[in-house]
């Protein structure tokens, strides 16, 4: 026989339609976003993982100063690897960006054509899709270097450049000012061959089964290569940021978004629990009568759980539909807006269904069952008498009669709803944390750019490069080349100052190993103004990231060797652009046995124009130093708006639902005050103002809590995700903005609650009179 209680469900839904509609919307949007994200993330991760085999991605690469001879290549391949040429040339374009030109790769690191066609004739080029998007280029447009104009025939994704790192040691990839492209073999040969980089990819004959074995194989291979040729750089695949940064980032994003889902579900479940408790209080007489009539506690628990679970299921269903259609494209667009990923096919994600549908329903069931089981343990007689307290009657908190009647009344309202306000506080902390992150990142990036600009070592840092001929087999050629290099790197620029440099790596630990540039500067340097003496200074970025203070010792290692160096820190130099170490030029040259006259580059405040371009390895200027903030702004700028909107939505829902409960809980008292002649405005001052006071206090209390939490989150994110360091700087106006957003949100909700107070009838006070 059907239970008559089912007939109550439509009436309960109608009477609480506003509450259930709001909860349904937030659940559908939250589950839709998470489902869309997990489906897009899973599909793109599948495409990313499959690309290693589909596009035959290299197991690593190495660079040499000169092209390998057939004999050298044969000797290296005796180490159970296959070596492939993958030469490239970097050139500046007239739009201010740098392009890395490749020939089309047909054996290793194959190319995914996203749009258009591959270049077939001279003057045609296929550019990276991400670079094209960021520079507003499309098929049919042209790009130009100093000598030639290329017409874009296709947009591509290079399988070994899913993240556009110009240098593997860079803190962040740069898809705005750096790109990769494919040209015909004829056009490649026509480029400046002086700048060709002899880059070689290798593939193991037998793939290593584990990462540990891969590391061992890479170390053995590097030692074998060192006996054959001088290696300029050696990067096994597992260390290649251009390949693995994307996959690692997608994996970490997934964990974060799942945690977000469960936190929202838990908050909503507790809100449901409180609303159900309020319903039980309102219907205490009915529940007592039903229990006395023979209905069991189990039947009533199932009845009151029905609507929350049904709403959760419908919200999950609608959310999944949105996730697999509209929102999947939004989430995929975020990844395509950051990374040069190949095309993907949407795949069914059973794990996403479990996480976004089954788990939220289980959370709702467990929390609501627990609350209902606890609330319905009282006897039927107690429900009929409306005595819902399991303990002795609480004594009212004594309030001084010196306080005005309105103030005392508001305090009573606050004390009566303390549990609701605690849940509200949790909701405010969570929403504020999201809002904090959304407002903080643009502010941090802007401050980082300003900080870099203010404390650059020099407007230009020129790193010199020894020509290939200087390390050839012929001693005479080497001597002549070094003499030409010595004369060719002299400059008449009056702002130029020599420095020596050496690169070491940090010891991996809490953070992954990263490159550290050691600068050797002149004793009376006009650029590095520090009392170096025989001591060592570290940059503020180094000190902040690794929490090093003057007097501490730091240990660094050779990148491709096991040799280590330990230095005692004399002081911290105000430079946040890189993880760096400073010492005198004589000390650096002596420490690394470089020769007393050795120098590696120039500091300068104006461009150096009298050094041959072939001797300049790289130029570090403001554009190079701010690539981190520039790329993060491009990658995450749109996402921050989404985060802010989501935070405001959480604010409104939690405040609306709990404010609504407080009004309903006090409906009889509100009705009585109307009978006594109080106006709607005066009643609003009693109830709405009470909640407003609590909201203001909770908003203010949440700020220091969120600051502590954000410091921890930001540090972990920087240590695990990036090389280099960005200082966490919180603009004071962010606190004002967070407070105003929370307060304005409550004002908007208060207007809705004022309408609800106006609708409370006077005869409500005559009902349920004991």
Where are the regions a protein language model picked out?
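Hydrophobic alpha-helical transmembrane segments of multi-pass inner-membrane transport and secretion
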Residues: 15-44, 249-288, 306-323, 354-366, ...
């Amino acid at each position: 026989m059907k239970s008559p209680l089912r007939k109550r469900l439509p009436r309960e839904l109608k009477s609480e339609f506003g509450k259930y509609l709001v909860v349904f919307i937030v659940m559908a949007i939250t589950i839709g976003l998470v489902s869309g994200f997990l489906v897009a993330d899973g599909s793109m991760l599948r495409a990313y993982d499959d690309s290693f085999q589909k596009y035959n991605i290299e197991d690593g690469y190495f660079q040499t100063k000169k092209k390998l001879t057939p004999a050298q290549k044969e000797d290296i391949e005796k180490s159970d690897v296959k070596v492939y040429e993958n030469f490239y040339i970097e050139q500046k374009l007239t739009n201010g960006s740098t392009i890395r030109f490749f020939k089309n790769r047909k054996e290793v690191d194959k190319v995914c054509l996203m749009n258009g066609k591959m270049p077939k004739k001279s003057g045609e080029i296929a550019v990276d899709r991400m670079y094209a998007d960021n520079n507003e280029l499309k098929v049919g447009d042209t790009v130009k270097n100093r000598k030639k104009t290329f017409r874009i025939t296709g947009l591509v994704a290079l399988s070994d450049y899913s993240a556009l790192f110009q240098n593997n040691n860079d803190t962040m990839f740069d898809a705005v000012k750096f790109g990769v492209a494919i040209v015909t073999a004829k056009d490649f040969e026509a480029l400046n061959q002086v700048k060709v980089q002899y880059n070689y990819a290798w593939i193991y004959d037998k793939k290593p089964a584990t990462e540990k074995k891969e590391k061992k194989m890479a170390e053995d291979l590097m030692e074998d290569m060192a006996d054959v040729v001088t290696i300029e750089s050696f990067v096994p695949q597992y260390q290649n940021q251009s390949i693995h940064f994307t996959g690692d980032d997608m994996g970490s994003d997934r964990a974060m978004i799942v945690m977000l889902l469960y936190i929202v579900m838990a908050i909503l479940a507790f809100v449901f629990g409180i609303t159900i408790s309020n319903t039980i209080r309102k219907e205490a007489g009915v529940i007592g009568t039903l229990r006395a009539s023979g209905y069991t506690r189990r039947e009533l628990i199932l009845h009151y759980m029905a609507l929350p679970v049904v709403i959760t299921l419908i919200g999950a269903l609608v959310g999944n539909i949105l996730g697999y259609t509209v929102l999947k494209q939004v989430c995929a667009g975020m990844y395509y807006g950051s990374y040069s990923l190949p095309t993907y096919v949407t795949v069914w994600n059973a794990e996403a269904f479990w996480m976004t549908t089954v788990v939220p329903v289980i959370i709702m069931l467990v929390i609501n069952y627990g609350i209902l089981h606890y609330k319905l343990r009282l006897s039927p007689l107690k429900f009929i008498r409306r005595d819902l307290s399991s303990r002795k009657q609480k004594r009212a908190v004594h309030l001084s009669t010196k306080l005005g009647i309105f103030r005392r009344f508001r305090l009573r309202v606050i004390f009566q709803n303390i549990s609701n306000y605690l849940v509200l506080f949790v909701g405010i902390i969570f929403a504020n944390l999201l809002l904090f992150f959304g407002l903080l990142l643009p502010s941090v990036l802007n401050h980082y750019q300003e900080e870099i600009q203010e404390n650059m070592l020099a407007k230009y840092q020129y790193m010199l490069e020894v020509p290939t001929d200087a390390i050839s087999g012929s001693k005479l050629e080497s001597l002549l080349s070094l003499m030409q290099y010595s004369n060719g790197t002299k400059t008449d620029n009056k702002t130029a100052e020599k420095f020596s440099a050496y690169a070491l790596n940090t010891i991996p630990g809490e953070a992954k190993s990263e490159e550290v540039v050691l600068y050797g500067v002149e004793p009376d340097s006009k650029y590095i103004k520090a009392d170096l003496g025989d001591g060592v200074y570290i940059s503020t970025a180094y000190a902040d990231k690794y929490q090093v203070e003057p007097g501490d010792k730091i240990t660094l290692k050779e990148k491709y060797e096991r040799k280590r160096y330990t230095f005692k820190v004399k002081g911290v130099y105000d430079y946040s652009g890189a993880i760096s170490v400073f010492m005198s030029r004589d000390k650096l040259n002596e420490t690394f046995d470089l020769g007393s006259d050795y120098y590696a580059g120039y500091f300068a405040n104006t461009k150096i124009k009298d050094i041959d371009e072939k001797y300049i390895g790289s130029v570090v200027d403001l554009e190079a130093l701010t690539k981190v903030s520039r790329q993060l702004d491009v990658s995450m700028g749109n996402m921050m708006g989404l985060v802010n909107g989501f935070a405001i939505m959480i604010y409104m829902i939690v405040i609306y639902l709990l404010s609504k409960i407080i009004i309903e809980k006090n409906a009889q008292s509100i009705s009585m005050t109307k009978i006594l002649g109080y106006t709607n405005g005066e009643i609003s001052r009693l109830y709405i103002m009470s909640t407003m006071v609590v909201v203001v206090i909770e908003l203010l209390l949440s700020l220091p809590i969120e600051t502590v939490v954000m410091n921890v989150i930001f540090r972990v994110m920087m240590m695990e995700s990036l090389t280099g360091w960005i200082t966490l700087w919180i603009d004071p106006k962010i606190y004002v903005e967070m407070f105003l957003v929370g307060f304005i949100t409550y004002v908007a909700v208060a207007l809705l609650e004022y309408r609800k107070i106006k609708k409370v009838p006077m005869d409500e006070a005559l009902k349920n009179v004991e």
